[in-house]
Amino acid sequence: MKIAFVIRKDCSRCARIAESIIDLLPKDWEIIYDHEAAKFLNSKGLDISQISADVIITIGGDGTVLRTLQMAKGPVLGINMGGLGFLTELEVDEVGSAIFKLIKGQYRITESMKLKVEINGDRVEDCTNEAVVHTERIARIRQFKIYIDGHFLSTMKSDGIIVATPIGSSSYSSSAGGPLLLPTLKGMVISYLAPYSSRLKPVVVTSDSTVEIKIAGRDQECILILDGQREYTVRSGDTVRISRSENSARFLSFRESVYDRIRDKVIKHVVN
């Protein structure tokens, strides 16, 4: 078994947790690290893009998970050192018992859809949570034209548009008023940031749909943001095309069902 560790930048506590996990793993398992973990553990590290493993253990928050899913190859087991940590599987106090389950093979691998993103036909990185087209500055409303499967949907004014996967619907899209989609669903949700008209409501489309966002108006500049990680400048006349990717995000899970994650990561936090 080959295990990789990816940790949050400049997090010495994350490195100590990685070290404690390594002490629990069988001695014949191969261990590799990203540069950040290696820096604290006095070992040789790899760029995340070079990491390929049977299990990739991330220690940090959702940002660490998303960065890993974007570049590394292998199912991710996330340990939460951040806030809500919807994409993470474990809290720190659950690590010990979970590692014993990992050693015994008592886990399952789940898959979630990713989004394929193109700018004027040129493909950029896939994303796991959402693609956001946003104005270049806060509170600068812009005009967008939205097409679904080549059919014109609407011209709208807003601060931006979010296209999210089911697993990403609990994140930025949710804060913009979008619905929560179960991760088992195959679809995308289109939601709006500060729309000019309150009558504009989020739209859910099937996963085999293609969503196109055209930057309308004259001399307009916006930013395309993927998973809060990568940014691209788009301008008037440019088209951002979003569809389901042939790639998927893989997670290692000890939970019996997806509903456990919804309950533990979303509902409990809302109720409490």
UniProtKB/Swiss-Prot annotation:
Cofactor: a divalent metal cation
Localization, UniProt: Cytoplasm
Entry similarity comment: Belongs to the NAD kinase family.
Gene3D superfamilies named among the record's database cross-references: Probable inorganic polyphosphate/atp-NAD kinase, domain 1, Probable inorganic polyphosphate/atp-NAD kinase, domain 2
GO cellular component terms given for this protein: cytoplasm
Primary location: cytoplasm
GO molecular function: ATP binding; metal ion binding; NAD+ kinase activity
NCBIfam families: PRK01185.1 (NF002255)
Residues the record marks as active site: 62
Enzyme class name: transferase
Protein purpose: Involved in the regulation of the intracellular balance of NAD and NADP, and is a key enzyme in the biosynthesis of NADP. Catalyzes specifically the phosphorylation on 2'-hydroxyl of the adenosine moiety of NAD to yield NADP.
Full protein name: NAD kinase
Pfam families: NAD_kinase (PF01513), NAD_kinase_C (PF20143)
Organism expressing this protein natively: Thermoplasma acidophilum (strain ATCC 25905 / DSM 1728 / JCM 9062 / NBRC 15155 / AMRC-C165)
Reactions performed catalytically: NAD(+) + ATP = ADP + NADP(+) + H(+)
Any GO BP annotation: NAD metabolic process
Source superkingdom: Archaea
